Curated annotation (Swiss-Prot):
Enzyme class: transferase
Cellular compartment(s): Cell membrane
Keyword Thylakoid: no
Family affiliation: Belongs to the UbiA prenyltransferase family. Protoheme IX farnesyltransferase subfamily.
Name used for this protein in its record: Protoheme IX farnesyltransferase
Catalytic reaction equation(s): heme b + (2E,6E)-farnesyl diphosphate + H2O = Fe(II)-heme o + diphosphate
Length: 318
């Protein structure tokens, strides 16, 4: 895979005004990996492993999967920063990224991305199993090639299909424990797939002017609030229904069942509130961001319940 390097024109576009110290340089490399995105992905990994094992897996397997998964996500994030550095300098939300400020050069970022990606696959392959390694390759490929290079600047549905990369950690986690991909893993994959639009589209509403300036067709930048809110509601309904399929098909117990139902109902209400405000032309950045942050809370609650579930009670069905 060859990534074309866009020319840097100023110090802010990739030529640091002075040499950074070790601590500052390390901080810049960490920022390249998009640690907030990485944290969110890792929230799903350990609970999925616990649920797959119906208990606590081997500690070394947990470490290999978590570290390998984190490095894979970090590699994908760094590749994304490298490719998108031309539009990152236009958008206020991304103007402090290391390649924009010049804290890291494009060459350094590209070498770092490849090194981290190769290391991540090696850790997953040998620390877990080859299937986990192959799924790690698929995750990086989908985020870098399918989302960043192909979809992001071409379609308002970019994060729908590009979001597949964000679903891969649950498949990697399940495969690490069982050496196969089974129906419960596919259900969890679909939950995150359906969760992605209600998570990102409210954010695109908040930063619609940024995306317009960068000519990135995020739905919140190219469609009105009413259209976006309808899509958020529809995807949220599908997500909640999908999450409940884990009860009959994944042998979920009482903790997961209660939390999936209650958290799902709460997030549905938030999605419908957004739609109601959009319908009355009273939607604000604050109300859009409330749904964005609510989506993170929902996913966190769901996967915490998934981790606790095997230790409490018996499966309700199956």
């Amino acid at each position: 895979m060859r990534l074309t390097q866009a020319p840097a024109t100023t110090a802010a576009a990739g030529n640091p005004p002075h040499k950074l110290g070790f601590a500052a340089k390390t901080k810049a490399y960490i920022a390249l990996t998009k640690p907030r995105v990485m944290e969110l992905l890792l929230v799903t990994t350990l609970p999925t492993m616990i649920f797959a094992a119906r208990g606590l897996p081997n500690i070394w397997l947990i470490l290999a999967t978590m570290i390998g998964g984190a490095f894979a996500a970090g590699s994908a994030g760094a590749f994304n920063c490298y490719i998108d550095r031309d539009i990152d300098k236009i958008m206020h939300r991304t103007e402090d990224r290391p390649l924009v400020t010049g804290a890291v050069t494009p060459r350094e970022a590209l070498v770092f991305s490849w090194a981290l990606g190769i290391l991540s696959i090696a850790i997953l392959w040998f620390g877990a199993n080859p299937l986990a390694g192959l799924l790690g390759i698929a995750a990086i490929f989908f985020y870098v090639v399918v989302y960043t290079l192909i979809l992001k600047r071409r379609t308002a549905q970019n994060i729908v299909w590009g979001g597949v990369a964000g679903c891969m950690p649950v498949l990697i986690a399940w495969a690490a424990v069982t050496n196969k991909v089974e129906w419960p893993a596919i259900i969890l994959f679909m939950v995150i797939f359906l969760w992605t639009p209600p998570h990102y589209w409210p954010l695109s509403m908040r930063y619609s002017e940024d995306y317009k300036a960068a000519n990135v067709p995020m739905l919140g930048a190219v469609a009105g609030a009413r259209i976006v809110s309808v899509q958020v509601v529809l995807y949220t309904w599908a997500m909640v229904v999908c999450s409940l399929l884990l009860i009959p098909l994944g042998h979920a117990c009482i903790v997961y069942t209660v939390v999936a139902g209650a958290a799902g109902l709460w997030f549905l209400l938030e999605a419908h509130r957004l739609h109601s405000k959009a319908s009355h032309d009273t939607v604000t950045n604050k109300s859009a961001m409330k749904v964005f942050h609510g989506s993170i809370s929902y996913l966190t609650l769901l996967f915490v319940a998934l981790a606790v579930d095997p230790f409490v009670g018996m499966p309700l069905m199956g």
